[in-house]
Amino acid sequence: MMIDIDHVSFQYSGAERENLQNFNLQIEKGECVVLTGESGCGKTCVTRLINTLIPHFYEGEMSGTVLIDGVDTRTIQPHDLSDKIGSVFQNPRSQFFSLDTDSEIVFGMENKGMPYQVMLDRYQQTIRELHIEKLKDRNLFDLSGGQKQTIAFASVYALNPDIFVLDEPSSNLDPEAIQELRRLLLLIKAQGKTIIVSEHRLYFLNGIADRIVLMEHGKLKQSWSASDFALLSTEQIKALGLRSYT
């Protein structure tokens, strides 16, 4: 089991109610799980459990356990899992540490003290495998929203984590950029990476997701395999408050 969230309840400091209530979710290695539901349902809270921002960055009251590849996240610091987990946030600018694309792609590797040749090899591999030659040596502030998202993804990809966590990655993207995001997700899916995506838009994840998890008021309301979810009619999906899957 790659990820095991066991009976977790969590309430942010200052929140009026629990943000997660007795939440359970198990994710196998190589599985792509999509968390969906209305804003405020707890999707982002789950992603923060997985990338260990909860409990180490966001304060609050937590019960239950979160195991990442068998390791209890309360017993280690986020940087100890940086080889295993990579995160792409809703607003890529929030995770940039550099002014140009090349520096941003290698930043995580530099921060880990990797040897120069290893960094160079991984940088070149990232550029080649993601097909982003046109984004080399660019000013980050000259890029479109979609291009910024691609660089944020590339900086994570260069570290070669086992788990990719993406929090509403399509929210600020146009249709063309969403298709580029889909291409990147298909790539890491084919590599056997474990993928967790918090999303309102679902159509671009058709053919990538293995499981769709609907959340409501901090609880897991319903879960489908991708094949079962694809059988739902447009009316059924709309009645659940979800967007089209096709």
PLM segments and residue spans:
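Conserved ABC ATPase "signature" region
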Residues: 117-135
